[in-house]
C-alpha cells in the first residue's frame, strides 16, 4: 500500500486543439491550451506552426494530431501519443475540444462521454450522496480522480481514494484535469480494494464505488465485497455504486443483481436509472 506519485507537468496537445489552430486563417497572437483545456496561454501562430513561450509546435505536429482529434500527444521532439501497452492498452482520450479527458483501457472508456463530460458525470454521481458537510468519504477505484475531486468540492472533510492499477495511477499523474487530486485533503492509496477494506474499521460516512465492468472485475460486484463495504460504513451512511447498463440491449439488467446482493449484505438499496447507479444506505 503506497501513495500516488506527484503530478507531472508536460505540454500536451489534443487533436481537437490542433484542428482549431490549423483552422486559423491569419497569423498572429492566439490563445493556446497545452494542458487540454485546463488553462490557456498566449501563443503566436504562423504557417510553420505555433510558439507558446519556449514551446514550439511545428506544422507537421499539428497535422498529425488533427488527423485523430480525440488523441492526446506529448509536445516533444518525437511527439508521441499519450498511450502505452502494458498487458492492456491504455490511452488518454479528449472527448471534445478543451473538455475533461477520459482514459481508455483496451478500447473501453472509463467515463461517460456522450451527453455529459467525464467531470460532470462524476459530479452527478456525487450529488446522489446528498449532504456531505464534514463527511469522511471513501472513493473506490480512483481512475483519473474526478470522483475524489468532486467529493472534496462538495464538502467532504477528508477523502480516501483507492486504485489498484499502477498504469491508471501513472495516467492520473500525467492528466492535467487530475491536478486537484493531488492535495493533502485527499489520501491517495495504491492497493487492491478488497485488501484495503479488510484493514478498515467502521470509519466512513459515504462511499463512491465506481468499478470497472463486471466482466473485468466481478469480485467488486459480489455479496462478499458488499459485506466488506457494509462493515466500513457508519450507521446511516450512504454508498453510491455505478453499474452502467451493460447488456441492456439483450434484456440483461446488471443493476437487479447488484440491488439484490447489496440488500443481502444489509443495505437498503435502490436503483437510480438516470445516473446508472445503485444508492444504498446502511440501516
Question: What does each model-found stretch correspond to?
Answer:
Residues 144-156:
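Conserved SAM-binding loop of SAM-dependent methyltransferases across substrates and taxa
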Residues 247-283:
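Class I S-adenosyl-L-methionine
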Residues 1-96:
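N-terminal auxiliary segments of SAM/dcSAM-dependent transferases
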Residues 158-163:
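Conserved SAM-binding motif I beta-strand of class I
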Residues 133-143:
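Conserved class I S-adenosyl-L-methionine
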Residues 164-201:
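S-adenosyl-L-methionine
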Amino acid at each position: 500500500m503506497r501513495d500516488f506519485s506527484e503530478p507531472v507537468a508536460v505540454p500536451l496537445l489534443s487533436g481537437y486543439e490542433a484542428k482549431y489552430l490549423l483552422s486559423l486563417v491569419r497569423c498572429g497572437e492566439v490563445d493556446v491550451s497545452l494542458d487540454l483545456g485546463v488553462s490557456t496561454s498566449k501563443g503566436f501562430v504562423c504557417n510553420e506552426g505555433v510558439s507558446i513561450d519556449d514551446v514550439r509546435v511545428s506544422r507537421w505536429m499539428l497535422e498529425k494530431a488533427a488527423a485523430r482529434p480525440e488523441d492526446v500527444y506529448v509536445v516533444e521532439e518525437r511527439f508521441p501519443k499519450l498511450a502505452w501497452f502494458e498487458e492492456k492498452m491504455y490511452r488518454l482520450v479528449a472527448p471534445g475540444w478543451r473538455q475533461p479527458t477520459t482514459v481508455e483501457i483496451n478500447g473501453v472508456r472509463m467515463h461517460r462521454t456522450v451527453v455529459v463530460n467525464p467531470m460532470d458525470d462524476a459530479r452527478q454521481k456525487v450529488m446522489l450522496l446528498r449532504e456531505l458537510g464534514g463527511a469522511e468519504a471513501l472513493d473506490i477505484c480512483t481512475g483519473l480522480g474526478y470522483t475524489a475531486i468532486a467529493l472534496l468540492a462538495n464538502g467532504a472533510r477528508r477523502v480516501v481514494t483507492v486504485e489498484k492499477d499502477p498504469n491508471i495511477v501513472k495516467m492520473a499523474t500525467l492528466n492535467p484535469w487530475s491536478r486537484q487530486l493531488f492535495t493533502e485533503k485527499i489520501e491517495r492509496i495504491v492497493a487492491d480494494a478488497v485488501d484495503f477494506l479488510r484493514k478498515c474499521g467502521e470509519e466512513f460516512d459515504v462511499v463512491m464505488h465506481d468499478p470497472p465492468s463486471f466482466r473485468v472485475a466481478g469480485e467488486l460486484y459480489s455479496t462478499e465485497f458488499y459485506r466488506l463495504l457494509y462493515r466500513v460504513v457508519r450507521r446511516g451512511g450512504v454508498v453510491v455504486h455505478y453499474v452502467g447498463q451493460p447488456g441492456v440491449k439483450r434484456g440483461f439488467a446488471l443493476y437487479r443483481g447488484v440491488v439484490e446482493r447489496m440488500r443481502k449484505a444489509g443495505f437498503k438499496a435502490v436503483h437510480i436509472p438516470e445516473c446508472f447507479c445503485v444508492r444504498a444506505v446502511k440501516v
